[in-house]
């Protein structure tokens, strides 16, 4: 029965809040901008307020399933594993949502929720990395890649458990894989800068 939590986490993670918020505003974010359902594209198309709303909702898809699993599961050998797996499944749900033919977002906001549960201190450090990276480079993708990629290191330095470090590393890897087109555009100089309107 413990493994019902990861399944529920996937189904919750698959809820496309960016698309739903866009629809409520009369727009289909899959047809505009980067055509991504994530907070960055929603912000570009619909403004910062709705972009932030998307960021918050998508982050909760990673955070809340882990909170629920940690709260409802009794203490056992598998408790930390189920909690971490629930976070991973929330991210996979966002990236590959069953409701949208498995075509979803890049997982940064949902990953943020997972990382926040694993270590608020690590998130605080990586948010600083994100802000500095975006400010100096002009690219949100650079900030997302660096911030997520460094989370496992911060967890290691902060003395987190091996399972938490592995979980963070796997989520970061998923985020990097979903950003492969951004990485290619960064290498060819064709990535869109946040500073350019």
UniProtKB/Swiss-Prot annotation:
GO terms, biological process: phospholipid biosynthetic process
GO CC term (a single one): plasma membrane
Highest taxon in the source lineage: Bacteria
Family matches, as Pfam families: G3P_acyltransf (PF02660)
Broad class of where this protein is predominantly found: membrane
Membrane-crossing residue ranges in chain numbering: 1-21, 50-70, 82-102, 112-132, 159-179
UniProt KW keywords: Cell inner membrane, Cell membrane, Lipid biosynthesis, Lipid metabolism, Membrane, Phospholipid biosynthesis, Phospholipid metabolism, Transferase, Transmembrane, Transmembrane helix
Alphabetized InterPro entries for the sequence: G3P_acylTferase_PlsY (IPR003811)
Entry GO MF terms: acyl-phosphate glycerol-3-phosphate acyltransferase activity
Record's bilayer topology term: Multi-pass membrane protein
Pathway: Lipid metabolism; phospholipid metabolism
Recorded catalytic activity of this chain's protein: an acyl phosphate + sn-glycerol 3-phosphate = a 1-acyl-sn-glycero-3-phosphate + phosphate
Compartment(s) where it occurs, according to its Swiss-Prot or TrEMBL record: Cell inner membrane
EC number in record: 2.3.1.275
Function: Catalyzes the transfer of an acyl group from acyl-phosphate (acyl-PO(4)) to glycerol-3-phosphate (G3P) to form lysophosphatidic acid (LPA). This enzyme utilizes acyl-phosphate as fatty acyl donor, but not acyl-CoA or acyl-ACP.
Subunit structure: Probably interacts with PlsX.
Family, per entry: Belongs to the PlsY family.
Protein's recorded name: Glycerol-3-phosphate acyltransferase
Organism: Desulfotalea psychrophila (strain LSv54 / DSM 12343)
């Amino acid at each position: 029965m413990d493994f019902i939590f990861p399944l529920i986490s996937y189904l919750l993670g698959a809820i496309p809040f960016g698309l739903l918020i866009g629809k409520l505003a009369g727009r289909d974010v899959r047809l505009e901008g980067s055509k991504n359902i994530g907070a960055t594209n929603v912000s570009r198309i619909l403004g910062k307020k709705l972009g932030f709303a998307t960021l918050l909702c998508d982050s909760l898809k990673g955070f809340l399933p882990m909170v629920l699993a940690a709260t409802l599961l009794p203490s056992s050998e598998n408790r930390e594993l189920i909690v971490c797996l629930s976070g991973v499944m929330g991210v996979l749900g966002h990236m590959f949502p069953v409701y949208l033919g498995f075509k979803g977002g890049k997982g940064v906001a949902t990953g943020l929720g997972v990382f926040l549960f694993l270590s608020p201190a690590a998130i605080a450090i990586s948010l600083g990395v994100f802000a500095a990276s975006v400010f100096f480079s002009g690219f949100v993708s650079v900030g997302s890649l660096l911030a997520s990629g460094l989370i496992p290191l911060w967890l290691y330095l902060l003395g987190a458990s091996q399972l938490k470090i592995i979980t963070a590393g796997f989520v970061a890897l998923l985020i990097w894989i979903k950003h492969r087109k951004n990485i290619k555009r960064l290498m060819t100089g064709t990535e869109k800068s946040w500073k350019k309107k």
